Amino acid sequence: AFTIAVPATADTAAEVTIGYLVADPDKVRKFVCVEVSDIPDVAIADPDMMVSMPAGLTAATGMDALTHAIEGYTAKGAWELSDMFHLKAIELISKNLRHSVKEAKAGKPDSGREGMALGQYIAGMGFSNVGLGIDHAMAHTLSTRYDTPHGVACAMLLLIAMEFNKPVAAKRLADVAVAMGVDTEGMDTESAADAAIEAVR
């Protein structure tokens, strides 16, 4: 059947990825399932579909999207094409997430939703080709065991994951800092990687 997918949140990029999760509360775990036929024929990332999200959901889903982009960029399988997607996603999400949360709290129309919609979309295009990392591996267990929203679990673990990966991914984390708008001129690689971690904090 011909399918059209229109997401109502800016996080999972399920409309452009081949994976999905199934939670098993009895086994206290989530199973990652992959099925190419789950990709819809048409995907429409319409920011107007996301304007009703409350501030908490906006923050949680936005941090999931940022985690996708950062983990995808620092993944072992990362390559030139996925790098372009991930760096642009980091830039868009970093520019728009705080504004979107602030506007959601105020109950105002949100000009940042378009950037969030595009950022999560292209992050999904990137990570579906290279995979994710330790943050998501831990977040799946945390969210299942403690009934924590997935985006909140990802946000709680992102700094830990970045610190853990820094010894082997400092250069890539330095690139993340630049994509987040940090002025890294004059910094060495390790300092710039630390600046990325601080920017996420």
Residue spans of the language-model regions?
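Carboxylate- and glycine-rich phosphate/diphosphate-binding segment that chelates Mg2+/Mn2+
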Residues: 16-130
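Proline/glycine-rich low-complexity loops and linkers
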Residues: 1-19
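Short beta-alpha connecting loops at secondary-structure transitions
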Residues: 51, 140-141, 185
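Amphipathic alpha-helical interaction segments
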Residues: 84-88, 92, 115-118, 137-140, ...
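Acidic, glycine-rich active-site loops and adjacent beta-strand->loop/helix elements
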Residues: 8-12, 49, 159-162
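Gly/Pro-rich interdomain helix-loop hinge
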Residues: 145-201
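Glycine-rich phosphate/pyrophosphate-binding beta-alpha loops
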Residues: 11, 121-154
